[in-house]
Amino acid sequence: MALLSDLINLDLSGRTGKIIAEYIWVGGSGMDVRSKARTLSGPVDDPSKLPKWNFDGSSTGQAPGDDSEVILCPRAIFRDPFRKGQNILVMCDCYEPNGEPIPSNKRHGAAKIFSHPDVKAEEPWFGIEQEYTLLQKDTKWPLGWPLAYPGPQGPYYCAAGADKSYGRDIVDCAYKACLYAGIDISGINGEVMPGQWEFQVAPAVGVSAGDQLWVARYILERITEIAGVVVSFDPKPIPGDWNGAGAHTNYSTKSMRSDGGYEVIKKAIGKLGLRHREHIAAYGDGNERPLTGRHETADINTFVWGVPNRGASVRVGRDTEKEGKGYFEDRRPASNMDPYVVTCLIAETTMLWEPSHSNGDGKGAAAP
């Protein structure tokens, strides 16, 4: 008799030319990832050739019960590390039946910014450092922690050993699964707080950064589901003298990566400072809890940048300063930020927005 594991790993390629496409979308909370699968007649490698689909938005907080149909539009395709073969993961965004984006569809606005000719010409690169915390399912307490608290921070960052590193098997599985899927995941590391980890998606261009980070989050959610562990993107899961969790966003444009780029970087950082409040408002919920000026953060109410200051709002690396070109790191985004929102706002502020007397208070103005 076949075991459940045998059927999960069943290879369909020798029996049918059909494939399974898992359609993924961002749910109504802005942080939940939802998905459902459908059968296609054969392999597809172009999202424009995939059929649109729909779902019950009243069950995800995205539509009322008396008009609940929400349309899924495929935007990006990834290899499916769970079903393997020709099966695919499909990142989608969501629309009303009349074609208007629903309020929780942040990709639509990001795609408009990234399709602007001035932005496209600069080829914006992003590298997002996604931090997260692994929690025990029954207690919602960090993985590996005793019922009370472990020893203070210090031994856990990038550590090895059963008394210092918790959940590495989950993290490594997610790492390999993302590579298999075709995500530009560039690394992983254990974080300062035990049970907390980080992966990096980099470099990714334009709206693709958001697509890739959301699918990486989905893969991580699926793997923790299998492991019976909860993944938390709360920016400060444990109060007190423990590091929070962020999504530091590294950024460069073609001009920044070229000779003389350091001056372009400094001008861009100046613009970010003028719109500090607007960026903070868009950089994730609960960000006031980690951004205290402690634990490698800047105070939420203050904008400061420096080389190579990890207590700054924006950090410039030594290599960038030395070479006179490169990238910078925005250290303000929380771990629960929406990558579509953060990446397009950074691009808009640094490339499309210009300060004026009427908006010099830092609130800024909408880009064209």
From Swiss-Prot:
Native organism: Zea mays
Tissue specificity annotation: Found mainly in the vascular tissues of seedling roots.
EC number(s) recorded for this UniProt protein: 6.3.1.2
Catalytic activity: L-glutamate + NH4(+) + ATP = L-glutamine + ADP + phosphate + H(+)
GO cellular component: cytoplasm
Region named Disordered: 38-66
Origin organism lineage: Eukaryota, Viridiplantae, Streptophyta, Embryophyta, Tracheophyta
Job of this protein: Plays a role in the flow of nitrogen into nitrogenous organic compounds.
PROSITE patterns noted in UniProt: GLNA_1 (PS00180), GLNA_ATP (PS00181), GS_BETA_GRASP (PS51986), GS_CATALYTIC (PS51987)
Record localization: Cytoplasm
Chief place where the protein resides: cytoplasm
A Pfam entry, by short name: Gln-synt_N
Location of the GS catalytic domain: 106-368
Gene3D superfamilies: Glutamine synthetase, N-terminal domain, Glutamine synthetase/guanido kinase, catalytic domain
Family to which this protein belongs: Belongs to the glutamine synthetase family.
Any one Gene Ontology BP term: glutamine biosynthetic process
Domain GS beta-grasp: 19-99
Description of how the protein assembles with itself and partners: Homooctamer.
MF annotations from Gene Ontology: ATP binding; glutamine synthetase activity
Protein name as catalogued: Glutamine synthetase root isozyme 2
Alphabetized UniProt keyword annotations: ATP-binding, Cytoplasm, Ligase, Nucleotide-binding
